[in-house]
Amino acid sequence: MPNRLPMPPAEPLLNAPEFTVSELSQSLKRTVEDAFGHVRVRGEISGFRGAHSSGHCYFALKDESAKIEAVIWKGVHGRMRFKPQEGLEVIATGKLTTYPGSSKYQIVIEALEPAGIGALMALMEERKKKLAAEGLFDEARKQLLPWLPEVIGVVTSPTGAVIRDILHRLEDRFPRHVLVWPVKVQGEGSAEQVAAAIRGFNALPEGGKIPRPDVLIVARGGGSLEDLWSFNEEIVVRAAAESMIPLISAVGHETDITLIDFVADKRAPTPTAAAEMAVPVRSDLFVEVADLARRTRAYWQRAHESRRSELRAAARALPAAGDLLAIPRQRLDSAGAALPRGLKANTHAHFRRFTAAGAKLTLRVLHGQIAQADHRLTVCGERLGLSARSLLRQRRDRFAGLEVRLRASKLSNAQAQRNAIARQRERTHRLAERANRALVTLLQRLDARVEASGKLLSALSYRGVLARGFALVRDEAGHPLHSADSVGPGARVEIEFADGRVGATTDADRPAPPAKRAQQPKPAAQETKPAPKRVGKPVDQGSLF
């Protein structure tokens, strides 16, 4: 028979403490919580199917050889910046405890973060595919930026260097009205604030108290992928996609890529570049407008000269009214002059034939034929006269109409030339008025400068000192005297006051001043300086009067 271990005595088992199932579960719960407290656990999320109807989240954390149940309460889940995703490797921070209902230990997660850059990149790629499948990144959805916006809305932190860079760049290029919606750009709640700012700008009414922006800039400085993660959240991406205002994303540096860059209407590598995309350079616009104005003036000048040359050529090509009527008038005069001669010649010819025929006829027949011929001749003469007068009247009416049309054409051309001359005269008058106004402005400025110079000259003149009660003493040559030693006894001097000059002679009994050393000639600028103020009166100085 196989060897068996001896059974322990029954008496010690009877002394072991007795627990109910609930008591044992609670004891194990206290032991686990006291022994471990808060822990950080690294593992892969498994079994996550989204939040429960109660708002709590239940899943498991596992690695290659073990698994632990995890729970996130509703309030904690709502405050989390990083939400759990199935299959994502994370680092969970929470409190280790047990669930008495099934005697299983679990971790109550209070904070969740991805385990390294790889996990974040995988999550970002998954979101990118999901949003792209919804068509949020399609180029057809994107709007064109306004050429020169009146109001620019900026969503960024109000205390960072980003807003200063944007404002400075806008000031350099083309100052515009800027509205800043201050938000947190990283950390808990930052994604919600950015999305709310984008939707808030879009909710502003047209013509309201706060102007509605024409373009939006969502900006943030550079940082790590974790720092920029708020701009990868779906709430921010969807808010940017729903924006009816054209949006420029300027998150991070040129090498930083976030999901908002794919849905924005334009992506700028830096916040400064976003400001450059929003507005053109004002000086370039001034140059372009000036060039267009110059080209327009040159075009109209060329067109005006061309039309004037064509008008002059057409006027030279037109014949004079008298020349048009000269030849028809000459023909009419020739026809009128030849008509009586033709009538006479025709009458003589018929008369000769009549005479020849009359010799062959009897007197009675001859008289009858003569009477008939005379009647026919009279009728023909009347008809010929009527026809000639009618033809002459028609020709005159025709030539009168031609003359009226030619005069009207000439008057119309002359009126057009007078109108052009009047326009040029009016333009010259306007230019002269502008030149006169500029000349008046220049003269006013020069008068102001002359007046200011006169005031400065009066302030610096020695006459201002005389007006305060001082006097200027000169010798007979008119040179100012700077000391009492320079005046000999009995010398003639001239004293200038503010209101005039008087002559004076120094005391004769005053001792002569000592001989002065030869001094270097002073510059002319120093001769006009007033004598230095003396304290008291020298004992040897006599009265000047």
Curated annotation (Swiss-Prot):
CDD domains per the UniProt record, alphabetical: ExoVII_LU_OBF
Keywords per UniProt: Cytoplasm, Exonuclease, Hydrolase, Nuclease
InterPro entries: Exonuc_VII_L (IPR003753), Exonuc_VII_lsu_C (IPR020579), OB-fold_nuc-bd_dom (IPR025824)
GO cellular component, one term: cytoplasm
HAMAP family, alphabetized: Exonuc_7_L
Major enzyme class: hydrolase
Compartments, as annotated in UniProt: Cytoplasm
Subunit structure: Heterooligomer composed of large and small subunits.
Biological-process GO terms, alphabetical: DNA catabolic process
Function: Bidirectionally degrades single-stranded DNA into large acid-insoluble oligonucleotides, which are then degraded further into small acid-soluble oligonucleotides.
EC number(s) per entry: 3.1.11.6
Region Disordered, annotated ranges: 499-545
Chief localisation class: cytoplasm
Domain of life: Bacteria
Keyword Heme on entry: no
Catalytic activity annotation: Exonucleolytic cleavage in either 5'- to 3'- or 3'- to 5'-direction to yield nucleoside 5'-phosphates
Compositionally biased residues, Low complexity: 515-525
Gene Ontology molecular function, alphabetical: exodeoxyribonuclease VII activity; nucleic acid binding
Stated family: Belongs to the XseA family.
Lineage: Bacteria, Pseudomonadati, Pseudomonadota, Alphaproteobacteria, Hyphomicrobiales
Keyword Hydrolase: yes
Name the record gives this protein: Exodeoxyribonuclease 7 large subunit
NCBIfam families, A to Z: xseA (TIGR00237)
